[in-house]
Amino acid sequence: MNRILKQVSNTKGKGIRFYSSSSQLDSEYMFPSVRRLLVEYGINSSKEVTATGPQNRLLKGDVLAYIKTKNLSPVDRLSLIASSVKSSQPSSSSSPSIVDSPTLTSQIKDQIKIVTTITNDKNKSKVIYEDIPNNNIRRVIATKLSQSKQQVPHFYMTVECELDNVLAMRKSMPENVKISVNDFVLRACALALRDNPQANSKWSDEHGEAILNPTVDISFAVSTDRGLITPIITNTDKKQLLAISNESKQLALKARDGKLKPEEFIGGTFSVSNLGMFGITSFNAIINYPQAGILAIGTGRKVLRPPSTYQPIETNLNASYGSEGKSEIINTNGPLTTEQLEKLFDNTVSKKQDIKQQIINEQPQPPKYEQPKVANVMDVTLSGDNRVFDDEIAGKFLSSFKYYLSNPQNMIL
């Protein structure tokens, strides 16, 4: 027999009372939709509603009309059950729980268990966690990154650069000279900015146009315990590779020790962020506002390069069998003499095996083709301010950067 849950109030407090459909709801033939409406709107008894159906049966329309007349609203069943459970639970722990009542349907039991769990959880102690406050550097970084992402129209371009020549040059250097791949990257970036001055610009909100920077000052990202710092190598394009390497090491050490002066990390005209040491293939960096561009450097990886051409690079199509392998033609206008017959026999019979072997040895060889090769490459992604960079400027800058990195001998001149 179906049961429904009813909330009642009396002088002793609130409780849960269950009614049989044959008693308070008066009819065993009540439609499910009617029963659902009675429960949803907190109508305690079907007697409150005037039935107009056959054999005095309560119809859905009757309940809807009653709801409209009384201007009723659906009740919060979970709140209803929660308050009922709280007031109905006995004080003694040995008393049976109301959830164990045999008169409850399984659905209502599940709801009561859920609400009881929520109620009990509220009484438990809160989860302990550690709140790590931001330091001043992290606050400044968060403000600048938010400002950059919200106000600067970012766009992205990626180019693949070969590292074979850079790696070969590093290997050929003396052991006491320690120049990293990132030093080559900084030098290549500086020269590319020098060759493409429009890429070394910034946007002026005051003038509403891009302004060229007079110097090439590259910021490079350094991770510290206090946050990400970007020390600046001033006049990078005018410094040789070894000078850039030494200065970047000194600035990185000072950044980790917290000893950088303001002029050593505030400013800059362009930035480089390298995550290759973490195995990151490629990523998009946020522009270091008010700069207009930043290069995101990925890790080096090996790829298989197909041949640049599929035409033969070496052939042996003009092989000759030699004079000994050729049949000698004997011209005569008359009958062959004995001497001529012997000579002809020698050329065609006695040397047959030698001629055959010589022909086999001097057969034309198949043509040789250029073979695929393994190359070391890395992806470099430019994040640019689209107010300063257009496609042509960005393309020329990345092309110059790729050229210098692929031909490092031009960076030490």
From Swiss-Prot:
GO terms for cellular component: mitochondrion; pyruvate dehydrogenase complex. Residues 29-67 form the Peripheral subunit-binding (PSBD) domain. It comes from the Eukaryota. GO terms for molecular function: acyltransferase activity. InterPro entries: 2-oxoacid_DH_actylTfrase, CAT-like_dom_sf, E2/Pdx1, E3-bd_dom_sf, PSBD. The keyword ATP-binding does not apply. It is found in: Mitochondrion. It holds the Pfam family 2-oxoacid_dh. GO terms for biological process: glycolytic process; pyruvate decarboxylation to acetyl-CoA. Residues 1-19 form a transit peptide. Keywords: Glycolysis, Mitochondrion, Transit peptide. Belongs to the 2-oxoacid dehydrogenase family. The pyruvate dehydrogenase complex catalyzes the overall conversion of pyruvate to acetyl-CoA and CO(2). It contains multiple copies of three enzymatic components: pyruvate dehydrogenase (E1), dihydrolipoamide acetyltransferase (E2) and lipoamide dehydrogenase (E3). This is Pyruvate dehydrogenase complex subunit homolog DDB_G0271564, mitochondrial. The lineage of its organism: Eukaryota, Amoebozoa, Evosea, Eumycetozoa, Dictyostelia.
